[in-house]
Amino acid sequence: MSLPELKNFRRIVVKVGSSLLIDSAAGEVRATWLAALAADIAALHRDGRDVMVVSSGSIALGRSRLKLPRGPLKLEESQAAAAVGQIALARIWSEVLGAHGIGAGQILVTFQDTEERRRYLNARSTIAKLLEWRAVPVINENDTVATAEIRYGDNDRLAARVATMASADLLILLSDIDGLYTAPPVANPDAELIPVVESVSAEIEAMAGGAESELSRGGMYTKIEAAKIATTAGTHMLIANGKIEHPLQAIADGGRCTWFLTPANPVTARKRWIAGSLEPKGTLTIDAGAVTALRAGKSLLPAGVIRVDGQFARGDAVLVRGPDTHEIGRGLVAYDAEDADKIKGRSSPDVLIILGISGRSEMIHRDDLVIGSVPGV
């Protein structure tokens, strides 16, 4: 089987763990390594790729800055350390990417931001705008306010959620190990690297060892969980050794890693979810011109809406019907029912006047819209 090549992916999420970013002995950033990684990111960026970074390290950096003793931290201590570390982490990424003329935008999220639909849409829109502006979003779990999430390995799963949210076609988990082995390689010298996983089966899950370092809360188990999230959403994933300099270039050169493949693509998987998994909360009836536009792949604008029915919140699924009441499709609406009713039939510039805020130009963005049927639904 021929494996994918890095050059063929257009939108990439790179997850960097604490054990890679921070020198455990000195408690400081591995500056030379990070500069090399930033150069790799800049190379992808120059080639026209959209690149996002999910970076751990805020608690570890905060511990160092505050000179806290080694050992476990209580919840409130972890949160306070994260508050200090987040400032340092943002500055570090801004500097290393800025050296290549790339702007960095910090986004702090929790799992709730990726699962509650209104917050999900806000975060997704922010990421999309940063990418449109050719900035690199640097995303970290908001450990200052998170509770149960401040625990071992969540940034692996968070990275998968971010990749799904951003419709990325590749998630790279940089680790302190080459990939998934048939057994934990430290304990078993006969363990073999698995170069490709086409489906996360029970057998694959059983191979997940407990590779963990003092600074990292991650392990192979959470990486397998991340793979399930990513591949279900149409995102390929790979695990590669990040301890070497220029780890992304090593992947591009065919270096050792484990690929987790998916037969779907992010847009198809997302639309399958919208079409088959969400209960519509209302209905938008649109005019004939809007029907033609939607079938041509356009977004639904307020001007094309002639009637709003139901009680729905921003981010809810709604049905879209033509003037003859025939169902055209369904999608995630960018306004609640009250505001949608106010701006129906109006041009996008009128939204600011009517609502007092600029709002979204689309009632439903085309990426959040399913017209007709989706394969597999």
Swiss-Prot record:
Give the EC number(s) under which this enzyme is classified.
Answer: 2.7.2.11
Could you list the residue ranges forming a coiled coil in this record? none
- First-listed, main subcellular location of the protein, grouped into a coarse class: cytoplasm
Kindly state which keywords UniProt assigns to this record, in alphabetical order: Amino-acid biosynthesis, ATP-binding, Cytoplasm, Kinase, Nucleotide-binding, Proline biosynthesis, Transferase
> Catalytic activity, per the record?
L-glutamate + ATP = L-glutamyl 5-phosphate + ADP
Q: Which GO terms describe its cellular component?
A: cytosol
List, for all copies, the residue spans of the domain called PUA. Answer: 281-358
A GO biological process this protein is involved in?
L-proline biosynthetic process
Cell location? Cytoplasm
One matching Pfam family is PUA
Which PROSITE patterns does the entry mention? GLUTAMATE_5_KINASE, PUA
Instruction: Note the InterPro entries from the entry.
Output: AceGlu_kinase-like_sf, Asp/Glu/Uridylate_kinase, G5K_ProB, Glu/AcGlu_kinase, Glu_5kinase, Glu_5kinase/COase_Synthase, Glutamate_5-kinase_CS, PUA
The terms under GO molecular function for this entry are:
ATP binding; glutamate 5-kinase activity; RNA binding
Q: Which domain of life is it from?
A: Bacteria
Q: What class of enzyme is it?
A: transferase
Respond yes or no to whether keyword Phosphoprotein is given for this record: no
Record-listed ATP binding positions: K15, S175, D176
Does Transferase count among this protein's keywords?
A: yes
Q: Which residues are listed for substrate binding in this entry?
A: S56, D143, N155
Q: What does this protein do?
A: Catalyzes the transfer of a phosphate group to glutamate to form L-glutamate 5-phosphate.
- What protein family is recorded? Belongs to the glutamate 5-kinase family.
Q: What is this protein called?
A: Glutamate 5-kinase
Q: Which gene name belongs to this protein?
A: proB
